[in-house]
């Protein structure tokens, strides 16, 4: 009987031990999706050192690559709510055809350029010559409408704060 009581006490103590229930990785980069190239519709980056993933809900992740009036336009955006504010990160081209295996400088928003985008509520800002970055297209499949790549950039917001977007990756199916 005494052995049974000891065993019950040990089992009770062990069952009360608190294993961390949250298995979310603590390293922000480990929270990002893997860099795939199969059209998984994934997007992630580090925004000022914190993991940025599209938020739950409709219209939080969108990708288009279109040929309009003789020119190509690429647009990728991801949005999420942070502290009750809508925050968006994205990439795009204006009258610029993208190609697999090519790296593009993210600079000012004008014809022939690739740009990075940061949005906070109603304000949208784009990369510039003084706050720039790069986007690399690692896969472009026009038959399956898949575009994948990596990116990083610095961007200044409407208040003059410079945000660092790092370790960005995307694997999207795009609409035309």
Language-model segments: residues:
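C-terminal or internal capping secondary-structure element at the end of a domain, subdomain, or sheet
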Residues: 133-176
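Short, isolated positions in well-ordered beta-strands
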Residues: 52-53
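Sec-dependent bacterial lipoprotein signal peptides
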Residues: 1-17
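Surface-exposed helix/loop patches within compact recognition domains
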Residues: 57-143
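Bacterial Sec-dependent N-terminal signal peptides
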Residues: 15-39
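A short, compositionally biased
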Residues: 36-41, 69-72
């Amino acid at each position: 009987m005494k052995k049974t009581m000891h065993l019950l006490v040990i089992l009770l103590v062990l069952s009360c031990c608190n294993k961390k229930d949250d298995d979310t990785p603590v390293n922000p980069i480990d929270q990002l999706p893997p860099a795939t190239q199969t059209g998984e519709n994934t997007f992630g980056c580090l925004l000022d050192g914190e993991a940025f993933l599209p938020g739950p809900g409709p219209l939080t992740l969108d990708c288009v690559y279109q040929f309009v009036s003789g020119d190509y336009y690429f647009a990728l955006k991801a949005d999420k709510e942070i502290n009750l504010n809508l925050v968006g990160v994205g990439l795009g081209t204006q009258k610029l055809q993208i190609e697999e295996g090519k790296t593009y400088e993210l600079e000012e928003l004008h014809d022939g350029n690739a740009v990075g985008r940061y949005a906070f509520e109603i304000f949208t800002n784009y990369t510039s010559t003084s706050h720039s970055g790069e986007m690399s297209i690692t896969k472009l499949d026009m038959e399956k409408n898949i575009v994948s790549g990596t990116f990083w950039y610095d961007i200044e917001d409407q208040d003059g704060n410079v945000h660092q977007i790092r370790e960005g990756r995307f694997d999207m199916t795009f609409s035309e």
